[in-house]
Amino acid sequence: MSIPADLKYTQSHEWVRAEADGSVTVGITHHAQDLLGDMVFIENPAVGRTLAKGEECAVVESVKAASDVYAPVAGEVIAANGEVESSPESVNQDAYTAWLFKIKPANPADVDALLDAAAYQKVVESEAH
């Protein structure tokens, strides 16, 4: 699976898409869902919640394990995707369209500091060894 070049990434396997309105959309990467296996439960943060960068804010559970999802940037949660909560398997089907939540960043420059696709590819490769 190729890593989309138009997204940003975190060391903890979240993807981040900058939106035209200044918000960011967050999901888990294909690599993360591949490691976790079949998703059975997703809990997103509440809309209106203020997050610190790196804060545990969502949970994804699969048949193999439960994993925390971390806020890639500080900011306020402005949307949560109820569709992935009711159909967690959609993350397995296409991790890059099945987003989890949206954040209005406290500092938009924080998004630029996240990993690009090439840097994230190196993270994935380093974990494979």
Curated annotation (Swiss-Prot):
Keywords: Lipoyl
Cofactor(s) the record lists: (R)-lipoate
BP GO annotations: glycine decarboxylation via glycine cleavage system
Keyword presence, RNA-binding: no
Residue ranges of domain Lipoyl-binding in the record: 23-104
The organism's place on the tree of life at top rank: Bacteria
Cited CDD domains: GCS_H
Membership in a protein family: Belongs to the GcvH family.
Cited function: The glycine cleavage system catalyzes the degradation of glycine. The H protein shuttles the methylamine group of glycine from the P protein to the T protein.
Name used for this protein in its record: Glycine cleavage system H protein
